[in-house]
Regions:
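Aromatic-residue-lined binding/catalytic grooves and analogous aromatic/hydrophobic interfacial grooves
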Residues: 23-25, 234, 239-269
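Inward-facing hydrophobic residues that define packing positions of alpha-helical scaffold repeats
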Residues: 52, 123-126, 206, 213, ...
Length: 330
């Protein structure tokens, strides 16, 4: 009996020790406080709406994420053109790098000197939304079908826009060699961090861009009305026009442009309206603008790293960095 009692006591103590150890270490198994499991986070259309918000936030950028429409994408076109140049006498170094490209890797990549990371963040978030929307696994897939389809179509337009921008920056113009030269990597599904897709040709990039736009437009899920800060049908078609024009497909571009002119509510500003219309409070502000990035509060804006500070003269009424000035020829 003494032996059995000893064995029982030892077994009980061991069980208690395992149980106590498990309880003491259970705090190590908590979900990350700053992240969500991508595979289980999107359960219904409300979750999908949150992903949509994150998608548009990536397009907006902020003071830490300026390497897309937060700043760099706007300035890139000016600096690589003929009318704007860097101010070498006293510039802050925030715009001189637009004149050159240099090889970099993920180990020393900086988000402030290349239009690269954030467009792919936009693509990654769009991929996640599209995958969830088309999975058929959302709990309210039937009753919220119209909303889900709209978010899906919007994501395809933004994915096309990001790939279009990347292709134009890092690939040769399509008309040079009909797109046979290297473009950028195409991602149409969520990627693992270890994946390194190779560069597709410019033609393949445009094929993916056109497919996304065509699918979004033909889905009949995009609204025709204007919701500030969000993609609608006419914005998608306007982007389609730009794609066709970039490829030199003028008849296609004209056909879609005439559709927009004839059937949408958008009209060009009159010369007398042009200056005032840039103010969001002006009655004509949305008359011509089909899609604009909405900045709602101080968490959305780029603060001192935005284009306003870059262009503002150091000695002006609202002084900035004065990095960007007009050329003498202009």
């Amino acid at each position: 009996m003494k032996i059995l009692k000893t064995l029982y006591t030892a077994t009980l103590c061991a069980a208690m020790a395992v149980s106590t150890s498990s309880c003491l270490n259970s705090w190590l198994d908590q979900s990350p406080a700053d992240g969500i499991d991508a595979e289980t986070a999107i359960k219904n259309s409300d979750d999908l709406a949150n992903v949509r918000t994150g998608l548009y936030a990536a397009v907006q950028g902020n003071s830490s994420l300026i390497n897309y429409y937060g700043r760099l994408m706007f300035v890139y076109g000016d600096m690589r053109g003929e009318d704007i140049q860097y101010e070498y006498n006293g510039g802050s170094g925030r715009a001189n790098f637009y004149y050159y490209m240099e090889y970099t890797t993920a180990d020393n990549f900086t988000t402030s000197t290349a239009v690269w990371q954030m467009p792919y963040v936009v693509i990654a978030r769009a991929n996640r939304l599209i995958q969830a929307a088309e999975s058929g696994n959302l709990t309210d897939a039937a009753e919220a079908k119209a909303t889900i389809d709209q978010y899906d179509a919007e994501a395809k337009v933004l994915r096309a826009m990001a790939l279009f921008d990347l292709t134009r920056i890092y690939g040769k113009p399509y008309t040079v060699d009909q797109g046979s030269s290297p473009g950028v990597p195409i991602a149409t599904s969520p990627l693992e961090s270890t994946e390194k897709p190779s560069r597709s040709t410019v033609a393949q990039c445009y094929e993916a861009i056109e497919k996304d736009l065509t699918d979004a437009i033909n889905s009949n899920a995009l609204p025709k009305t204007n919701e500030v800060g969000y993609v609608n049908l006419w914005a998608a078609k306007a982007l389609q026009v730009r794609v066709y024009m970039t490829k030199g497909e003028w008849s296609k571009a004209l056909s879609v442009a005439e559709d927009i002119i004839s059937n949408s509510s958008y009209k060009l500003w009159e010369p007398s309206e042009y200056v005032a219309a840039w103010s969001k409070s002006d009655a004509n502000h949305s008359k011509e603008i089909m899609f604009e990035i909405s900045i709602n509060n101080n968490t959305d804006w780029t603060d001192r790293e935005g284009i306003a500070y870059l262009y503002a003269d150091k000695a002006g009424a609202s002084p900035g960095y004065g990095d960007v000035i007009v050329t003498k020829d202009f």
